[in-house]
Amino acid sequence: MSVSAVGSFWLSPSPGKLPRPRMVVRSSAVSVAPILTHLQKQCATPLPVLRHVADAMAADMRAGLAVDGGSDLKMILSYVDTFPTGNEKGLFYALDLGGTNFRVLRVQLGGKDERVIATEFEQVTIPQELMFGTSEELFDFIACGLANFAKKEGGKFHLPSGRKREIGFTFSFPVKQTSIDSGILMKWTKGFAVSGTAGRDVVACLNEAMERQGLDMQVSALVNDTVGTLAGARYWDDDVMVAVILGTGTNACYVERTDVIPKLQGQMSSSGRTIISTEWGAFSNGLPLTEFDRDMDAASINPGEQIFEKTISGMYLGEIVRRVLLKMAEAGALFGEYVSEKLSTPFILRTPDICAMQQDNSDHLDAVGAILYDVTGVKSDLSVRKMVVEVCDTIVKRGGRLAGAGIVGILQKMEEDSKDLIFGKRTVVAMDGGLYENYPQYRRYLKEAVTELLGLEMSKNVVIEHSKDGSGIGAALLAASNSKY
């Protein structure tokens, strides 16, 4: 998944054209308090639930490493086995394609003493028609953007003589990686329907387009954004072992020993380690789900899939809250005699909206009232607003705590194979994504769950650090550490 797709929860599915406000009469007058109480009970994540989730995550990881298709978790091999050391020197580029924009970036590296001397980046919006065009059209457009960006190179940026410019390519769509610099596109997602790419090597597609543009560059590393985040954070801190993206969608990757990956079948890396992309959004074992989750899943474009993602990531939290409020409005007259048509519109309430409501500290919760009115067309008094905030908190608390349990599951799996190498010393988890960055309550619940599961002493060794937009630099660094030179 990508920074633009996963890493920012400010993107949300367009709900389409809103219907004209029409009033529908509520069905019955039941008090809403029991609905909230029942919701809180179903969403509860006491320690035994968290422990089950962490253990199941570790077990699913093992099964996914044993054989392809062994569990819900794909456990994709990244082929990254040389990590940035800090000694890298020279000029490297990164290209990040993961949503409706792509980013191009250049970085001048100065080795151990100077590290990152300078960086520059640009963002380019992909025209809607190219998302439904041919492979050549899309990649020609990207190569053209890259060529225009490369033309502006100057100042502190200079390529050592006799070298070709090298790129780290962050491509955040489902890819079956075949080496550090090649991967077959399995299918387009996120609203893309480009013809002629599925089943092809995406690096070859880009290389051919660069040739057509007369651009003398080559891809040295193909990565997803989670792997890029890990590499970018590890460049500054050798203790980084895990990277997690929590934004519109979610994923996690970590550093694994190659001798504990049965499906590698004896292929060893020079360092004895590699990065595994867990694709943990597909995890589903033992999660506390409600009727609202089941209904939302059934109505989604991928029913029965990505259940963990649908419980913890930014694309879905607002929608779950909306579904709860709709039931409260219909069954318990939460917003009066009528239910606004807007409240019945899927995805009209976004995670940034529920985040903003939870930040309201005013006496009358004026911001909550304004958001409810502006976004869902309902009027509310103070007691109603308090209940709405409780609903938001219930859904966000569950999401944050389950994400924390997932992180502990990854650490547990690593610890089982390398006694005291994880919990016995400082271990850093690099976090990126708009949900983690912008939602303080979510962040707090995540960290509390990690502490509860590990205990106060052991959890002191686990450092959760925000690594903002690390995946672009990370991709350039992986191009450098896997450089042909």
Predicted regions and their residues:
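ATP-binding/phosphotransfer module of carbohydrate and carboxylate kinases, centering on a glycine-rich
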Residues: 2-165, 236, 293-485
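Short glycine-aspartate micro-motif
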Residues: 92-96, 164-168, 221, 241-245, ...
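Short beta-strand scaffold segments in enzyme catalytic cores
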Residues: 102-107, 228-232, 243-244, 250-256
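Glycine-rich phosphate-binding loop and adjoining helix at the ATP-binding site
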Residues: 123-143, 147, 175-234, 238-242, ...
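Gly/Ser/Thr-rich active-site cleft segment
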Residues: 160-218, 224, 237-238, 248, ...
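Generic beta-strand/beta-sheet core signal
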Residues: 170, 223, 255, 432-434, ...
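Short, internal active-site loops enriched in acidic
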Residues: 172-177, 226-229, 433-437, 469-471
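Short, glycine-/Ser/Thr-/acidic-enriched flexible segments
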Residues: 249, 259, 283, 322, ...
